[in-house]
């Protein structure tokens, strides 16, 4: 899953699933909005794109085709992305019509996509049901959140049966305090379903942490996938000296795996299954940076997690050990989030 604006090298992506991915036409890229702070952005493209990957099922029984929706976004604009084509350019869909105006929040901080391809977004104080209408991303529903004194940076859907015993998927938001909250999409009611726990001495690969024992903070995003009834979850986190304050945090993000069983319980329990590793540059990869941070958007595909950094970089992260390769530099495009359907293929790392 790549947005390639200025090629900076690549790592091989997983190839467990093949198919073709259709997006909208071209269109100019936009200067991204900035995190949860006010910034300007212009978009001149008039294109639309659904970001829909279609693959035919294999094996006996003739499984029907499945649509995989995948997106990335800046503070103010939505793009479709192609998980199967590392060299494919992003396709600008359009600007969010509920962001940046009078009385509106300044930036969309993340989005989530359910198994039906429906898109929901989140900002500092609200959630939105999003629909693509021509070259505009319309906020069809806007619900104000009773914000628990921390900014929401991450959004995903918990697959059916995780937080609800029915076939219903549930929206889950993550905040700077390292807390996960289910979100009622009818009225915005928040219910806590865990935290990321505390920072260990090291990541299991010999890389130590300066803030051992402190609560993990969410660096930017979470992603959950159904995985055929064996759900998988990941988060990009960081260690900070005084959580939930974002000052003085480690300049290297860490990939963690989520215990989807513990997520079901209401409360402040740790739901971290395993620290996969710090996002350090893999041997043989290009790019000047030796570590990666501010992964405000992540989306999983096969054995990789793709990170969209607010530092204008897109990286491919190994979901086993957190090692990372720079895939693209995106000057003047500051990523705020990413989302992929809960039906996206994933190769679960060993526990």
Predicted feature residues:
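Blade-level signature of beta-propeller repeat domains, shared across WD40, Kelch, NHL, RCC1
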Residues: 311, 316-351
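Beta-propeller fold detector
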Residues: 88-100, 137-147, 190-208, 264-287, ...
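Structural motif
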Residues: 75-81, 126-131, 177-184, 241-259, ...
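Conserved beta-propeller blade signature
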Residues: 68-73, 79, 118-121, 128, ...
